[in-house]
C-alpha cells in the first residue's frame, strides 16, 4: 500500500504526461497493457475514436478496447459520457470482449456499477484501472509491473521526478501487500 506522499508523487507525475498520444498517458497505458497481456494494441488517431483510445489486435484472441482518462483530482469522470463510449466501442468493434477504463483518478463505486450494468446488457466485460486515492489502486499496480518503462516515459516527457517514481514502483514490486 502506498503512503499518502507516495500516492501523491505517482498521481502528480502521471498527470504531468500529455493526456493523448504515443508519448502521453495513452501511450504509457498502451505499452503497459501490451506488456501484461502480450497482445498488440493500436492507438486511435485523434478525432472520432468510437469509444476507445486504443484496441487490441482482432485475430483469434480476446478483443480489448481501452479508454484513457488522465484527469486531476478535481475533475470528475462523467458516467453518461463513459457509457456512451462503451456503447460506441461495442457497436464498432465486432466481438469486443472487454472494455477497460484507465483513469488517473479514483473511479467511484456508483460509476463503476453503472458501467458494469451497461456492459452486462451489451454482453461485454468492463474493467477499471485507476488510482483510488488512498491505496495503490489497480493503475499503480499496473505501473509497478514495469517500473523502468514508466520512469522512461516520464523522463522522456520531462517529468522532473521520473527517477523517484521509478524507484517507488520498484519498491512496490518488492512489497506487493
Predicted regions and their residues:
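Mixed-charge (Asp/Glu-Lys/Arg
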Residues: 1-177
Amino acid at each position: 500500500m502506498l503512503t499518502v506522499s507516495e500516492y501523491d508523487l505517482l498521481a502528480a507525475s502521471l498527470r504531468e504526461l500529455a493526456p493523448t498520444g504515443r508519448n502521453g498517458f495513452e501511450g504509457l497505458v498502451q505499452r503497459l497493457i501490451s506488456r501484461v497481456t502480450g497482445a498488440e494494441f493500436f492507438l486511435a488517431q485523434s478525432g472520432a475514436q468510437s469509444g476507445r483510445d486504443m484496441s487490441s489486435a482482432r485475430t483469434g484472441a480476446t478483443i480489448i478496447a481501452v479508454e484513457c482518462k488522465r484527469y486531476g483530482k478535481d475533475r470528475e469522470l462523467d458516467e453518461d459520457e463513459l457509457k456512451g463510449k462503451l456503447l460506441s466501442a461495442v457497436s464498432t468493434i465486432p466481438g469486443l470482449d472487454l472494455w477497460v477504463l484507465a483513469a488517473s483518478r479514483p473511479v467511484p463505486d456508483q460509476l463503476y456499477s453503472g458501467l458494469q450494468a451497461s456492459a452486462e446488457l451489451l454482453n461485454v466485460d468492463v474493467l477499471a484501472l485507476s488510482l483510488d486515492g488512498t491505496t495503490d489502486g489497480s493503475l499503480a499496480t499496473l505501473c509497478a509491473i514495469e517500473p523502468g518503462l514508466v520512469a522512461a516515459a516520464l523522463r522522456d516527457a520531462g517529468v522532473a521526478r521520473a527517477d523517484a517514481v521509478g524507484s517507488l514502483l520498484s519498491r512496490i514490486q518488492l512489497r506487493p501487500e
